[in-house]
Amino acid sequence: MTNDFHHITVLLHETIDMLDIKPDGIYVDATLGGAGHSECLLSKLGKEGHLYCFDQDQKAIDNAKIRLQQYVKTGQVSFIKDNFRHLKSRLADEGIYEIDGICYDLGVSSPQLDERERGFSYKKDAPLDMRMNQDAQLTAFDVVNTYDYRDLVRLFFKYGEDKFSKQIARKIESARKEKLIETTAELAEIIKSAKPAKELKKKGHPAKQIFQAIRIEVNDELGAAEESLTQALDLLALNGRIAVITFHSLEDRLTKQLFKEVTTLDVPKGLPFVPENLQPKFSLVNRKPILPNARELSENNRAHSAKLRVIQKIRN
């Protein structure tokens, strides 16, 4: 693996074990990233099995081709440079209309966070960017400097869940009248200045939630996740599974709600029996999310907020 794309995979074995891999199955890693999940999954596939890997970051794909070269040589893995919201159409391009399993590791990958010039981190000064796909148009700079006060407040409340959203939006509006806000450090300082002193003493960086909100907006992360998960449910073969790792409450809420909708019986009360065609087609594999164990938490700080949810198709 190349040294500049180091990534510790979260909930690695739990995720792949929960997919219940069939050696000759067709699988998808919707979020290739550092290729940890892909490598583990491929090790369980036979010669007839195949894995399709999605990522919109060319660096991630280039790295994965090196890390997974033994499977590239045997033709067991394919790479698709695209947003996973195009899951169904891009798999159709490959002649795939049904899959046995798919895994998602949502959010931004560690290498993207660590690469200063990508502008994801409030800890490293860099131009405001935050694009997972470097070919995309909208950047964090655009959001911070062109969104009006109301849109910023809506964004910070909805995606950042920050109770000081109004104060922060006002500070941004005021600061950019003097000069454009160009770097992550500038933005982080403006956010800090908008919060009361007692708030700054609390654990965690004061800019964390706002940076998350801007990142979600720039990449339409929740919209893409909902579209992709809905398509994944349609693509699943009988007994196929979807495994989703989330890192914040917004992603987890979306996943939990979507899974609940397709696993809950929706019939009139008082019905003496439920016909087969009205029974849910899906079932939760784990009622409660799977969390990292103590060892993983001690080795990987990023794992602290991780949750794994898994669903299975039980009827056609």
Swiss-Prot record:
Catalysed reaction, written as an equation: cytidine(1402) in 16S rRNA + S-adenosyl-L-methionine = N(4)-methylcytidine(1402) in 16S rRNA + S-adenosyl-L-homocysteine + H(+)
The record's annotation in SUPFAM superfamilies points to: Putative methyltransferase TM0872, insert domain, S-adenosyl-L-methionine-dependent methyltransferases
One GO cellular component from the entry? cytoplasm
Where would you find this protein in the cell?
Cytoplasm
InterPro entries assigned to the protein according to its UniProt record, in alphabetical order: RsmH, SAM-dep_MeTrfase_MraW_recog, SAM-dependent_MTases_sf
State the EC number(s): 2.1.1.199
- Identify the domain of life: Bacteria
Q: Name one GO biological process term.
A: rRNA base methylation
Report the top EC class in one word. transferase
Keywords, A to Z, come to: Cytoplasm, Methyltransferase, rRNA processing, S-adenosyl-L-methionine, Transferase
Tell me yes or no: is ATP-binding among this UniProt entry's keywords. no
Job description of the protein? Specifically methylates the N4 position of cytidine in position 1402 (C1402) of 16S rRNA.
Q: Which PANTHER family match?
A: 12S RRNA N4-METHYLCYTIDINE METHYLTRANSFERASE, S-ADENOSYL-METHYLTRANSFERASE MRAW
Family of the protein in this entry: Belongs to the methyltransferase superfamily. RsmH family.
Q: What is this protein called?
A: Ribosomal RNA small subunit methyltransferase H
Recite the lineage of the species. Bacteria, Bacillati, Bacillota, Bacilli, Lactobacillales
